[in-house]
């Protein structure tokens, strides 16, 4: 029997969900999950440590490390190889903004679950 899904908490949805090379046809498509996007946002944009990111997402630090490695690989593949990057899916729940571990950027807004 498999383990039940442990939902990853995210604080905000991406404002843009598709990125593609300008001036040339994409050389393929990569899908980054919303929880992978959240680790990039928290660790690279908000300068959170893996530990802080793990607390914000309600997962173990080792889980964050794995998610982050996968996200960075996908991001590099899209940038270097000229692939379209789509951000969608994943195992997540949107936070309500009332959690003490919520890490929101000023430029982002919480979206209610029915708006996603």
Stretches found by the model and what they are:
Residues 36-40:
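Short alpha-helical "packing" element that flanks the helix-turn-helix/winged-helix DNA-binding module
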Residues 72-79:
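C-terminal flanking helix
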Residues 15-34:
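Short, Lys/Arg-enriched anionic-surface-contact patches
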Residues 109-116:
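Conserved small/polar residues in nucleotide/adenosyl-binding loops
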Residues 55:
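Alpha-helical residues within the helix-turn-helix
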Residues 43-46:
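Short helix-to-turn junction characteristic of helix-turn-helix DNA-binding domains
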